[in-house]
Design a protein with these regions (language model features):
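A boundary/linker detector
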Residues: 1-4, 99-108
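Helix N-cap and loop-to-helix transition residues
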Residues: 3-6, 57, 68
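Histidine-centered nuclease catalytic patch
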Residues: 22-58, 64
Length: 108
């Protein structure tokens, strides 16, 4: 766990007017209610890099799964485009390559 990265994210995402943290991806105010889709969770922008963490709504965290931030944004955009124009084929270039889970790093 990278404590400095977490403290930095907390400072950057705190909204004193809302008295709440804001979701990195959506900007919505996060809750501390267990089971709420807006509940606060930690999200790794890159699953292989523990130094790049943000606070995200539980629902968004589940949607992102093991994708990098770039892969997630590309997939969401491709889905939105396909929802808007269902007659058009899905942009398969947005589909993330490789295995569904990142390979564990070899021991140092």
């Amino acid at each position: 766990m990278n404590t400095d990265a977490r403290l930095c994210a907390m400072r950057e995402q705190w909204d004193p007017e809302a008295d709440a943290f804001r979701c990195y991806f959506t900007g919505i105010a996060l809750t501390e209610e267990p089971g709420d889709r807006r509940s606060i969770t930690w999200e790794h922008l890159d699953p292989r890099d523990g130094s790049r963490v943000v606070l995200a709504a539980a629902l968004i965290n589940r949607m992102k799964a093991d994708l990098t931030e770039e892969q997630f944004r590309g997939m969401v955009k491709a889905l939105a485009d396909h929802f808007e124009h269902p007659e058009e084929p899905f942009d398969e270039t947005a589909w993330p390559p490789g295995p569904a889970r990142p390979e564990p790093s070899p021991p140092a």
